[in-house]
Regions:
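Active-site-proximal segments of metal-dependent phosphoesterases and phosphodiesterases across multiple
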Residues: 128-140, 238-290
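Beta-strand-turn-beta hairpins that frame and shape the catalytic cleft
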Residues: 25-32, 189-200, 235-238, 306-313
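Active-site environment of divalent metal-dependent phosphoester hydrolases
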Residues: 39-43, 66-71, 162-173, 190, ...
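Binuclear metal-dependent hydrolase catalytic cores centered on His/Asp/Glu-rich metal-binding motifs
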Residues: 194-237, 257-258, 272-278
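Binuclear metal-dependent phosphoesterase catalytic core
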Residues: 40, 189-195, 211, 215, ...
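Core catalytic region of metal-dependent phosphoesterases/phosphodiesterases
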Residues: 44-193
Length: 345
């Protein structure tokens, strides 16, 4: 017997009342949007917030490496012009050109800073002053991001959980204070719905770049074990761990010679040598605990999905310099992932 659309809707409504009468939850799954490695890109951050509304998600997860890598001074030359050492050098005239460059710098994941010629000379003469200024601007920018996210997400009833990555300084991540709709999940276990707890870890195994939060495999293993030990229902666990598990196909990068600085690609037979840069400790943890999903990043060019046992591993990748937001929609239910989709926008 084929039911009309109206009768079908009435039946579904009655079934919902029946489930509530039995004390059964109406909600069968939670929709997550996950993106990572924004590296300070203002354009990607704007798209992340928009994705929460566009995809109608309940949970937003912002993975590690959220801060930028470079500070670009915009120098007032005192004659109505401005100069910036950015993409070959820029000479600007008028407020409109300056605003355009500010947007370009911010969208690409860098920070701009206005200064006079004399202040620029002081900065050139003191690495300590540059480092202090850079840290201040990183911190202020991230706090502004959180404020914007709270304002936007409060209208949707969506909660965003953010973590740092190995490229982010601990003191910058520690400066993020929880708001009603934005939570600093770094190195915590967070309950994201009635069924699921999420392990959040932003460290990485050692890299050739010697980043602020590179750690040994032993330290990674100890921290992961500490976090997982507090989970009550491990069959419904979600991992949000920045570095991918080793040799999973989502951690493939060119091998670098770190005996020189900056590190250089290793070539063999005229071709770059590729290898799995992921973590052995994280792979062991996934094999041992079998979370329903592992949300990772770190390796921008290894976008994709794979499985380790029952665990779905997702690396959405990153194209932040182009302002392209790579992400993943993940629908999780009781002890399983119901569906997932990689996104670009």
């Amino acid at each position: 017997m084929k039911l009309s659309r109206r009768k079908t809707l009435v039946l579904l409504h009655l079934l919902g009342d029946y489930r509530r009468w039995l004390g059964m939850p109406d909600k069968k799954f939670t929709k997550i949007f996950f993106a990572t490695d924004l590296h300070g890109s203002g354009k990607c951050f704007d798209k992340l917030l928009s994705a929460a509304k566009f995809y109608k998600v309940e949970v937003l997860v912002l993975g590690g490496d959220i801060t930028g890598k470079m500070l670009v001074p915009i120098v007032d030359m005192g004659d109505g012009s401005f100069k910036a050492d950015y993409i070959g050098g820029k000479t600007l005239h008028g407020a409109e050109e300056v605003k355009s460059l500010e947007r370009e710098i911010s969208d690409s994941g860098y920070y701009y800073y206005h200064c006079s010629k004399s202040e620029m000379e002081e900065l050139n003469a003191s690495k300590e002053k540059v480092d202090k200024l850079f840290m201040t601007i990183m911190k202020d920018t991230l706090i502004k991001w959180v404020d914007r996210a709270e304002t936007f997400l409060s209208q949707l009833g969506v909660t965003c959980y953010l973590t740092g990555g190995n490229d982010d300084y601990q003191e910058i991540i520690d400066a993020v204070r929880d708001t009603p709709h934005v939570k600093n999940a770094d190195h915590k276990v967070i309950k994201i719905d009635e069924l699921h707890e999420m392990v959040n870890l932003g460290w990485s195994n050692p890299t050739p770049w010697k980043c602020p939060r590179d750690h040994t495999e032993e330290e990674l293993e100890a921290m992961t074990e500490k976090l997982v030990s507090s989970i009550s229902d491990k069959e419904n666990c979600v991992f949000n761990i920045h570095v991918p598990p080793v040799d999973c196909g989502l951690d493939t990068v060119p091998k670098l010679d770190d005996s020189v600085y900056p590190p250089k690609p290793v070539f063999q037979g005229g071709q770059a040598v590729m290898f799995g840069a992921g973590s052995t400790a994280i792979r062991r943890a996934i094999e041992k605990y079998q979370p329903i999903v592992d949300l990772c990043g770190h390796v921008h060019e290894s976008r994709g999905t794979t499985r380790i046992g029952r665990t779905l591993v997702i690396n959405p990748g990153s194209d932040y310099p182009e302002g392209m937001l790579r992400g993943a929609i993940v629908n999780i239910g009781d002890k399983k992932v119901l569906s997932f989709q990689l996104t670009s926008g």
